[in-house]
Regions:
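Active-site-adjacent helical/loop segments in soluble small-molecule enzymes
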Residues: 140-198
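Helical hairpin unit composed of two closely spaced alpha helices linked by a short loop
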Residues: 200-206, 230
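Buried hydrophobic positions in well-ordered alpha/beta secondary-structure cores of metabolic enzymes
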Residues: 13, 46, 65, 75-76, ...
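Short glycine/serine/threonine-rich phosphate/pyrophosphate-binding segments
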Residues: 6-10, 55, 78-89, 109-113, ...
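Residues at the starts of beta-strands that form the adenosine-phosphate
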Residues: 19, 98-100, 200, 256
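A conserved regulatory-domain signal marking ACT and ACT-like small-molecule sensing domains
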Residues: 214-306
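Glycine-rich beta-alpha junction loops
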Residues: 50, 80-83, 105-110, 130, ...
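Small/polar-residue-rich loop-to-helix segments that shape phosphate-bearing ligand pockets
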Residues: 3-74, 92, 105-162
Length: 306
């Protein structure tokens, strides 16, 4: 596995009895090392997305979806190496060619997207994305051929869009999904392809191995972007009662104080001033606008951090 593989994935694999070797900055470097290691130690190498049996096995996901959801219009599938979508698209197009197949690349690892529209393999120079499960630099030629034959469209989603998908699934569906798994939902949420309002769309959530620290960052940023948290840096006169008057303002605004830091020693401050960094729990865009207005009316100089 790459050295930056989430700890959850590493420990989970070890718990199943495997020896885990961490090598390289991305999948492709780990893959090259695995090939060498297998040759040097007389081991059998099973390719994670080019092995025909692996591809066929992943195609059964499509059979389950078609069995459970009648009259599917579109199926959206994350793409890393392309094994999952190759198997699924091959199965779907044999059963019902009318079903549209959409592949989703991470914008930070767009090799298959680039290759799909160029109709030839074009590797990425580098990859960087929170969706480590689809962070693949080099294109699989066999899978590209499957994709060109069976997939209707390939789109990309950036890390911000993937993070929004993770947060949506966590909050609305009560599902913990990794970046690679949330890419399909992100493509739907941000309308990366055309679809009718009444369309029946199936999205493949291909994994849940997300690092807890990464998840906490996504949640915190998501709360700020959805106007449910607000971070303010406020300058006030450093004298008894000043902080109480400021907190009274937030109480009157019905904003809950989550964290507060009081600094009177910063060299950027004038003598006699203090700087308050405060994080508030808020109830949306209009609530935050009201708080800004109240601070301006009370003549508190402030900067909002996002």
């Amino acid at each position: 596995m790459p050295e930056a593989t989430p700890l959850l994935k590493v420990t989970g694999t070890k718990a199943l009895g495997a020896e885990v070797i961490l090598h390289g900055d991305n999948y492709d470097e780990a893959y090259a090392h695995a090939l060498t290691y297998a040759q040097e130690n007389g081991l059998t190498f099973i390719h994670p997305f080019e092995d025909p049996m692996v591809i066929a096995g992943q195609g059964t996901v499509a059979l389950e979806m078609i069995d459970e959801i009648k009259d599917l219009d579109i199926v959206v599938v994350p793409i890393g190496g392309g094994g999952l979508i190759s198997g699924m698209a091959s199965a779907i197009k044999q059963i019902d060619p009318k079903i549209k197949i959409i592949g989703v690349n991470a914008a930070g690892a767009p090799a298959m997207h680039t290759s799909f529209y160029a109709k030839k393999a074009i590797n990425s120079k580098s990859v960087r994305t929170i969706a480590d499960g689809i962070s693949v630099r080099d294109v699989s030629q066999p899978n590209l051929e499957h994709i060109l034959e069976c997939v209707d469209e390939v789109v990309t989603v950036d890390d911000e869009e993937i993070a929004a998908g993770i947060l949506f699934l966590l909050e609305r569906q009560k599902l913990v999904v990794e970046g690679a798994g949330a890419a399909s939902v992100a493509a739907i949420m941000h309308r990366k392809f055309e679809f009718a309002k009444e369309a029946k769309i199936g999205a493949v959530l291909s994994g849940g191995n997300i690092d807890v620290q990464m998840l906490s960052v996504i949640i915190e940023k998501g709360l700020i972007k959805s106007h449910r948290k607000m971070k303010l840096v406020i300058t006030l006169i450093d004298k008894p009662g000043s902080l109480m008057r400021l907190t009274d303002l937030f109480r009157n605004a019905n904003a809950n104080i989550i964290q507060i830091d009081y600094d009177r020693f910063s060299t950027k401050l004038s003598y006699g001033d203090a700087q308050i960094t405060i994080i508030l729990e808020t109830k949306g865009k209009e609530h935050q606008a009201m708080i800004r207005e109240m601070l301006n009316e009370a003549k508190y100089p402030f900067v909002e951090e996002v």
